[in-house]
A protein has these predicted regions:
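Mobile genetic element proteins and their domesticated derivatives, centered on retroelements
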Residues: 14, 35, 74, 91, ...
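C-terminal domain-tail junction helix/linker
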Residues: 134, 156-160, 182-239
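Acidic/histidine-rich, metal-coordinating catalytic segments
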Residues: 129-147, 222-225
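RNase H-like polynucleotidyl transferase catalytic core
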Residues: 49-53, 104, 138-142, 157-175, ...
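Conserved, non-catalytic sequence blocks in retroelement Pol enzymes and Pol-derived host proteins
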Residues: 6-8, 24-26, 65, 80-81, ...
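Basic, flexible linker segments flanking DNA-binding modules
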Residues: 1-70, 223-232
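A short, conserved beta-strand element enriched in hydrophobic/aromatic residues
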Residues: 2, 72-124, 136-137, 165
Length: 239
């Protein structure tokens, strides 16, 4: 049932979910090699990606070691079976990978949408405040909705510091690009998307599952919320 519900998960992510279940129930965690063998026997391993052309890589490091110091944002388009399209913009924390906020529309993403996205992210992390207690970098590409003068001015007013990727290298915002691939692969492609309303209804559930369940290799195969909870607990305990 686990594999049937998550057909795009490889053996390491399946192992992470089984480990999480074992921890919750107080049982020993399964061995990752055993999970691999069982999935191989039953033909459940994912095929290796053959790869295409060489990808451009970000020369700097997008990820940070401290939460609430750098956020990144990007957008994606989801095509529906009836030809409608839903455009989504999102904000991630570059440490814990949580999808803090999103906006979605059947029109184009505007500067006003991005400003709403900023406010939602700030309120999610800090509550209703007029300005962040300390500045946070806001990493995006050079899309017009992000570089609009009013948007950049608004960002500065609330304590966000706009940072943009090189003009000819949108993939340098690698964390946001990875999130787009994850959302399309693990949620959109395995869900019914007959029309825009169906996508808009499912988006909150997809993002909740991503935040609560989806294991990240860079987080020790923990979900963003698991990572946040463990970080908070360790901070309170002084470890």
């Amino acid at each position: 049932m686990l594999i049937a519900d998550l057909p795009t998960y490889g053996y390491r992510r399946v192992h992470a979910l089984l480990r999480r279940q074992a921890e919750r129930e107080g049982h020993p965690a399964p061995n990752v090699k055993r999970v691999y063998r069982v999935m191989k026997i039953h033909g459940l391993l994912l095929q290796r990606h053959a790869g295409g052309g060489e990808e451009r890589r970000h020369e700097g490091r997008v990820a940070v070691d401290v939460r609430k110091t750098r956020w990144c944002s990007d957008g994606l388009e989801i095509g529906c079976e009836n030809g409608e399209r839903v455009r989504v913009a999102f904000a991630l924390d570059c440490c814990d990978r949580e999808a803090m906020s999103y906006v979605a529309t059947t029109a184009g993403i505007t500067g006003e949408d991005v400003r709403d996205l900023m406010v939602a992210a700030v309120e999610h992390r800090f509550g209703r405040v007029n300005r962040l207690p300390s500045e946070i970098e806001w990493l995006t590409d050079n899309g017009s909705c992000y570089v609009a003068r009013e948007t950049r001015r608004f960002a500065a007013d609330i304590g966000l510091v706009p940072r943009t990727t090189p003009l000819e290298s949108p993939q340098s915002n690698g964390m946001a690009e990875a999130f787009v691939r994850t959302l399309k692969r693990d949620y959109v492609r395995v869900s019914p998307v007959p029309d825009a309303q169906a996508v808009l209804r499912q988006l909150p559930g997809w993002l909740a599952h991503y935040n609560e369940v989806h294991p990240h290799r860079s987080l020790g195969y923990r979900s963003p919320r698991e990572f946040i909870q463990r970080s908070t607990h360790e901070g309170l305990s002084g470890n």
